[in-house]
Amino acid sequence: MGHKVNTLSNRLGLIVGWQSLWYSHYPERIKEDFKIRKYLENRLSKANISRIYIERSLNRVIITISSSRPSIIIGKGGSEIDKLKKELNIFIYKKIQINIFEIKKPELDAVLVSKSIASQLENRGSYKKAIKICISAALQVNAEGIKIKISGRLNGAEMARKETYKEGRIPLSTFRADIDYHMTEAHTNYGIIGIKVWIMKGEIYGKKNLFNIFKLKYKKKKVYSD
């Protein structure tokens, strides 16, 4: 089963927490969250955003953004944050709080690794070179394993094919294994190329507070909170 389902959803509630923390009015809230994430990802495309967490209370919405380039999001003296709040009022009619966390080791973040490979492919770079660089970088910062699967018309070949690159161990059926996973697409002149990335960071033993998003073994540094 661990090889078929989404790696993160398979661990949801065990060692992986929820990216949206709220209840009630599910259809409205899920649609609103989707619009917020889509807008922020497009608006902050140069900031290397990994994940966006949304928490709602009665009178406030807390948006937590993890990024490897937080200075782009914050701006000089927090000026960009103020702009973001005004722009987000299109979707949200409550008080907005924005927290920014810096990812100290982007090589261990599956979202950023997959986006990096996709960016190089869209700029007509070699997919083999891009993958080898990402694997080497992850292992240098003590990843226990990394697996990258790429599929599509690689190098403009007439027939689509799949290739898999793996170093170290990726125990998908071990629930205590802290494996980050992400899937993205590269839009090239030859069509869409799919990219999947798994990164094994270690194993988590005992209970874990799933609602305290950033107090993890692999910590992120909080750089801004209004």
Swiss-Prot record:
Gene Ontology annotations of biological process type: translation
Domain KH type-2, chain residue ranges per copy: 36-104
Pfam families the record matches: KH_2, Ribosomal_S3_C
A GO molecular-function descriptor: mRNA binding
PANTHER family: 30S/40S RIBOSOMAL PROTEIN S3, SMALL RIBOSOMAL SUBUNIT PROTEIN US3C
Function: Binds the lower part of the 30S subunit head. Binds mRNA in the 70S ribosome, positioning it for translation.
Name assigned to this protein: Small ribosomal subunit protein uS3
